[in-house]
């Protein structure tokens, strides 16, 4: 697949950055398509599974040739057939080839089981429909898509003490290279996370021509590896903890999604007409 002329690339978080709390893109969906028309490639970088991302793309109407994503917090890069330099395989269900950027959950399955069993926690990848809804807070069908994990496990418990125990135990294992504590879960994987995934993606033939302008956006401290890689970086800010943000150069968007992403594209359009960008 030949890379089309490219104005730049936008690496963006999804939840609370491009899509609102209900999981809908709304007006941001139209702006997503506008960004494509402007010559940008838009690459979601998210903890979501590829099946959730494809559902979002379908709802927006993203063309098949523009479907590129870093799924499960950087576990794999997905793109159209023929777009990746050294694909690991082809997912016929979603019609995309992929390159694994770490080990699949199957390779650390026993270890993940032992962590969850420490205090009766639940693995999202093994959750039933009711548990998946409880863990994700999503409607039943979307929760089922979220549970289809291949590279990032989400372990849930009602007990904060349980989650703290799982976190401290997981950090002792060298093979678990991605361990993050969220308010209600612990996310665990055998890959290097969002930032390293972006670095790898920019080496792909599909995105290499876009690297002259790299735009990034995120809404939480977990998105710092995304934000810090942007030449034009956006922080969707509403009472978030940004104490770990090292890179001081970013623009604050004082709106929630999906309006936040609309403002992002308007700013990109304005800045793209200046010599500095």
From Swiss-Prot:
<protein>
    <recommendedName>
        <fullName>Mannosyl-3-phosphoglycerate phosphatase</fullName>
        <ecNumber>3.1.3.70</ecNumber>
    </recommendedName>
</protein>
<keyword id="KW-0963">Cytoplasm</keyword>
<keyword id="KW-0479">Metal-binding</keyword>
<feature type="binding site">
    <location>
        <position position="219"/>
    </location>
    <ligand>
        <name>Mg(2+)</name>
    </ligand>
</feature>
<feature type="binding site">
    <location>
        <position position="15"/>
    </location>
    <ligand>
        <name>Mg(2+)</name>
    </ligand>
</feature>
<dbReference type="InterPro" id="IPR023214">
    <property type="entry name" value="HAD_sf"/>
</dbReference>
<dbReference type="InterPro" id="IPR006379">
    <property type="entry name" value="HAD-SF_hydro_IIB"/>
</dbReference>
<feature type="active site" description="Nucleophile">
    <location>
        <position position="13"/>
    </location>
</feature>
<comment type="similarity">
    <text>Belongs to the HAD-like hydrolase superfamily. MPGP family.</text>
</comment>
<dbReference type="GO" id="GO:0046872">
    <property type="term" value="F:metal ion binding"/>
</dbReference>
<dbReference type="InterPro" id="IPR006381">
    <property type="entry name" value="HAD-SF-IIB-MPGP"/>
</dbReference>
<dbReference type="InterPro" id="IPR036412">
    <property type="entry name" value="HAD-like_sf"/>
</dbReference>
<comment type="pathway">
    <text>Carbohydrate biosynthesis; 2-(alpha-D-mannosyl)-D-glycerate biosynthesis; 2-(alpha-D-mannosyl)-D-glycerate from GDP-alpha-D-mannose (MPG route): step 2/2.</text>
</comment>
<dbReference type="InterPro" id="IPR012815">
    <property type="entry name" value="MPG_Pase"/>
</dbReference>
<comment type="function">
    <text>Hydrolyzes mannosyl-3-phosphoglycerate (MPG) to form the osmolyte mannosylglycerate (MG).</text>
</comment>
<dbReference type="GO" id="GO:0005737">
    <property type="term" value="C:cytoplasm"/>
</dbReference>
<keyword id="KW-0460">Magnesium</keyword>
<dbReference type="GO" id="GO:0050531">
    <property type="term" value="F:mannosyl-3-phosphoglycerate phosphatase activity"/>
</dbReference>
<dbReference type="InterPro" id="IPR033980">
    <property type="entry name" value="MPG_Pase_thermophiles"/>
</dbReference>
<feature type="binding site">
    <location>
        <position position="13"/>
    </location>
    <ligand>
        <name>Mg(2+)</name>
    </ligand>
</feature>
<dbReference type="GO" id="GO:0051479">
    <property type="term" value="P:mannosylglycerate biosynthetic process"/>
</dbReference>
<keyword id="KW-0378">Hydrolase</keyword>
């Amino acid at each position: 697949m030949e890379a089309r002329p490219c104005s730049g690339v936008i690496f963006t978080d999804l939840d609370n950055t491009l899509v609102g709390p209900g999981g809908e893109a709304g007006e941001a969906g139209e702006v997503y398509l506008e960004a494509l028309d402007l010559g940008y490639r838009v690459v979601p970088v998210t903890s979501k599974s590829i099946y959730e991302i494809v559902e979002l793309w379908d709802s927006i109407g993203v063309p098949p040739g523009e479907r590129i994503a870093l799924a499960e917090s950087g576990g794999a890069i997905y793109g159209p057939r023929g777009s990746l330099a050294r694909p690991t395989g082809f997912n016929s269900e979603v019609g995309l080839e992929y390159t694994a950027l770490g080990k699949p959950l199957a390779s650390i399955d026993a270890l993940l089981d032992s962590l969850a069993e420490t205090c009766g926690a639940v693995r999202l990848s093994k959750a039933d429909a009711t548990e998946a809804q409880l863990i994700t807070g999503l409607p039943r069908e979307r929760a089922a898509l979220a549970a289809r994990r291949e590279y990032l496990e989400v372990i849930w418990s009602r007990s904060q003490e349980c989650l703290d125990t799982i976190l401290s135990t997981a950090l002792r294992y060298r093979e678990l290279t991605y361990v993050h504590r969220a308010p209600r879960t612990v996310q665990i994987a055998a890959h290097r996370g969002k930032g390293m995934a972006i670095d790898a993606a920019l080496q792909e033939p599909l995105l290499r021509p876009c690297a002259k302008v790299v735009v990034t956006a995120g809404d939480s401290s977990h998105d710092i590896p995304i934000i810090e890689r942007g030449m034009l970086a956006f922080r969707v800010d509403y009472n978030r903890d940004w104490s770990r943000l090292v890179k001081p150069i970013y623009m604050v968007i004082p709106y929630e999604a999906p309006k936040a992403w609309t403002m992002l594209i308007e700013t990109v359009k304005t800045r793209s007409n200046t010599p500095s960008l």
